[in-house]
Amino acid sequence: MTTIYLIRHAEADGNLYRRAHGWYDSVITDRGYRQIAALAKRFASTRFDAVYSSDRHRTMTTALSVYKTHGLPLVTTPRVREIGIGVWEDHPWAELERTDGEQLERFNTDAAHWHVAGGEYLPD
């Protein structure tokens, strides 16, 4: 039987500062590096055949916790990136709530019908 582990990236500066980061290439925080160390410990005895990551710094760095300790290559692809959020990239969530609250509500509740300038549209 095949087992697939989905691991969210460790804390990045966008999480810490509550900024909108989809394709924006944010960096891992000190807390994020501690989370990566904990992941490495958690998965130390787990067998992996492959490790995939998006091509964003925060995801590749988080994937270190698995691929490096298991001697595996890291396969990166933009096809597994978070959704691109266009003109919202690197703006504080609180600002977006004030300036584009209706679209933000749709993003949080009905992403299949959400779209913002320069961002991805899920049905595409």
Predicted features, each with a name:
Residues 1-5:
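Extreme N-terminal starter segment of soluble prokaryotic enzymes
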Residues 7-72, 76, 99, 120-123:
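Active-site-proximal alpha-helix that buttresses catalytic centers in soluble enzyme cores
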Residues 70-124:
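Phosphate-handling substructures
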